[in-house]
Amino acid sequence: RLLVFALDGKATLPKTPPKMMVTPLDDPKFTVEPELAAAGKTLFVKHCAMCHGPGAVAGGGVPDLRASAIVLSLEATSAIVIDGQRVARGMPQFGEMKKTDIQAIQHYLRDQSRKDLAKKNALAHTTH
């Protein structure tokens, strides 16, 4: 959005368009463990949020992990994050991380996905 001002201007700003909201994925069989989700949040903020966005809400240049089916698999996520499977695509390798770290991040992302999915569903019910 580009804003231009005039000293004698009387115009008001148009409403800000709503943020593009992806539909988070959920696996109902996945049980989020709150302690792991809390640890995962700390790890996500430290290692992931710079690219994948605060609260796991990506800005568009990288995958929004709340809507990624890859994150539903601990093995696939570990292969990308620890083993560097997507380095050629710009995803850095975090070889120092352990599978337990990835599991904690996975719990955080599932927790965020469920919270955001609930918000989106509640919003859909109030606007119809």
Question: Where are each of the predicted segments found?
Answer:
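Active-site lining segments that contact anionic ligands and/or coordinate catalytic metals
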Residues: 2, 45-46, 60
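Blade-level signature of beta-propeller repeat domains, shared across WD40, Kelch, NHL, RCC1
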Residues: 1-21
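Gly/Gly-Pro-rich "capping" loops immediately C-terminal to redox-active cysteine motifs
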Residues: 41, 53-86, 90-93
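Short, cysteine/histidine-rich loop/knuckle motifs that typically chelate Zn2+
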Residues: 50
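Flexible coil segments in periplasmic/lumen-exposed cytochrome c-class electron-transfer proteins
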Residues: 14-46, 54, 89-128
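Residue-level detector of flexible, active-site-proximal loop/helix-junction positions
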Residues: 9, 72, 98
